[in-house]
Amino acid sequence: MAKGKDKSGRLSVFKGHEARLNKAIFHTLALKGPQPVYALLKEIGKQRGFADTRYGVVRRRVEALEKQDYLMRVGVVKTHVGSYTPVYQLTPRAELALALSKTNLDSFIKKADYAQIIKMLETLKPC
């Protein structure tokens, strides 16, 4: 087997140093719906391994995911201090990434009938 980068089926958003936090943000927004960064931090902080996560880290990750078109701003909400903060939600790209990360493609290929396989091929064919 040749050396080099692993050609696994993992998506780039779920690879690397920030992968765990990306997954936590995606799952929280998928379960709780659109939220500002502070509410995201409160929910993520309840998860195992994220108790000491800081606001600035989550905010920077959310802004990076917004630039990559995985999150989008859907409004603003007034904070207790009186300022306004954006509310974020998942884009269809992020929802697809979550669905693909939960799908085992090997088992899909083995269990799918020809109609499902043909439909998947048509979807994945480049234009």
List PLM regions with ranges:
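Short alpha-helical segments that sit at the start of domains
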Residues: 2-34
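Short, cationic-aromatic polyanion-contact patches
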Residues: 18, 76-100
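Short acidic, hydrophobic short linear motifs in intrinsically disordered regions
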Residues: 35-45
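Short, positively charged loop/turn segments that connect secondary-structure elements
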Residues: 45-59
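Short, hydrophobic-biased segments on the C-terminal half of alpha helices
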Residues: 59-66
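A short, conserved structural fragment
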Residues: 66-77
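Amphipathic alpha-helical dimerization/coiled-coil segments
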Residues: 93-127
